[in-house]
Amino acid sequence: MASIDDDDDERTPLLQDSHIGELVETQKQLKSRWWSIRVMYLTMFLSSVGFSIVMTSIWPYLQKVDQSADASFLGWVIASFSLGQMVASPLFGLWSNHRPRREPLVVSITILVAASCLYAYVHVPASHNKYYMLLARTFVGFGSGNVAVVRSYVAGATSLSERTGAMANISAFQAMGFILGPAFQAALSVIGETGITINGISLQVNMYTAPALMGALLGIGNIILIFAIFREHRVDDLEKNVSSINSESEVTDVEKANEGPIDQIAVISSNILFFVVLFVFAIFETISTPLTMDMYAWTRTQAVFYNGIILAAVGVESVIVFLTVKILCKKTGERVLLLGGLAVIWIGFFILLPWGNQMPKIQWTDLQNATIHNTTQWTSSIPSSGNHSVEPTGCPVIQTWCLYTPVIHLAQYLTSDILIGVGYPICNVMSYTLYSKIIGPKPQGLYMGWLTAAGSAARTLGPVFVSQIYTHLGTRWTFGIICAFVALSLLHLTAVYKRLIPFSTRYERL
């Protein structure tokens, strides 16, 4: 394996070590280790599916089971997944540090299965059904807190030379889960709203509940695979030894063997950078539908359909990028790619800044409704087209910025989508990979839990932030603030650049 020189540190992947010896591993251990890693890939995929498989149907399902639910409560239902995951991630991570990882994995997936079943039964209670849905989604998120355990296991079960590829694969499976979840929902929509009812257990299987039940069945299959195939392995940071860790005593032995403190500044900086990456991507996901409806006068149906196609294309693009970074990392390094990914994200949002003299089409509906008592006679003289429920389109006049802020052209929007679809997956993979190497041989469960919690907090706060800024201040302020936010992150990354090195490399330099 190639060695690295200090002078060539910038272009050498950080996954390499100058004093790496031969890896002591039998063929049986190698096979078991990689089959266990593949089970973790599947676990990550199913966790993502659990989030996305009901996303397109949550709003109509919520309205069906509880007519008192409004759009603001829908926001809480959507955010509850990330809140549950944010709370659970450090807890499961800490658990995995002191016990075999099979325990938190099985418990978390069991919670996810139970919560998915609860989601399918929220129609049963006589009242307060919306709160049962909120509870169900919270616990689905809580069960998905096992992603910290998954990433910490893969980080510990791979050598430095294997880790970037393994982390890229995890992110690719996560992205595929987000892409295929809505596809599963679309396929199951043929069941219809009525579906079938199993009276003995009060279960309604319809287009809203079938995806959740499918998620529960996949979770049960995941648990079976964990018991049948998953075995815990660990590769030390010098890649000289592979050990099995499948009992409490073996976990304790590993903890005692790892000496030396972790660079906490590098750890905190990595969490901050990861928060920024997830924060801006959550904003990107949230704003796509209202932005296109306001800028291009798309109807709700058009916005959902066209943005669904765009986001699916971005998802496919992201999977390709996830797989490509494994090759790029061998020629550059994680830090260089992270810096480049953030720069691409900044360009993507900068392109969205409005310019020119063309204004968006204005939706005057709100003004007309406010003065309808003065115009009843005038409107009654207009010939009827037979359609009494034409959906108003355009930028609502109640958003006063629509009157003086230039339109964002469709070419700007599509170019931004492409760039963000490149920058986000690069930053995602590099953040996890660098973070795992900074922690080194230490138990990574709790640390990965904090990183996952930072991402969950970002996915919770991002939509809240953008909904307020966009509605009241408009596109110029929204994307201007995001550009400033990403620019500050680039400066922060530059400041801590030399500290973002593997644990083993740091102690070689001391």
From Swiss-Prot:
> Mind listing the GO molecular function terms for this protein?
chloride channel activity; iodide transmembrane transporter activity
A GO BP term here is:
autophagosome maturation
Task: Determine if Zinc is one of this entry's keywords.
Answer: no
**Parts of the chain on the Extracellular side:** 60-72, 125-132, 193-209, 286-302, 357-406, 467-476
One GO cellular component term noted in the UniProt record for this chain? lysosomal membrane
Which InterPro entries does the record associate with it?
MFS, MFS_dom, MFS_Domain-Containing_Protein, MFS_trans_sf
Stretches that traverse the bilayer? 39-59, 73-93, 104-124, 133-155, 172-192, 210-230, 265-285, 303-323, 336-356, 407-427, 446-466, 477-497
Q: What is this protein called?
A: Major facilitator superfamily domain-containing protein 8
The residues exposed to the Cytoplasmic compartment are 1-38, 94-103, 156-171, 231-264, 324-335, 428-445, 498-510
Name the cystine pairs: none
Q: Where in the cell is it found?
A: Lysosome membrane
Is the keyword tRNA processing assigned to this protein?
no
Q: What does this protein do?
A: May be a carrier that transport small solutes by using chemiosmotic ion gradients.
Annotated Pfam families: MFS_1
Q: Which species is the source of this protein?
A: Xenopus laevis (African clawed frog)
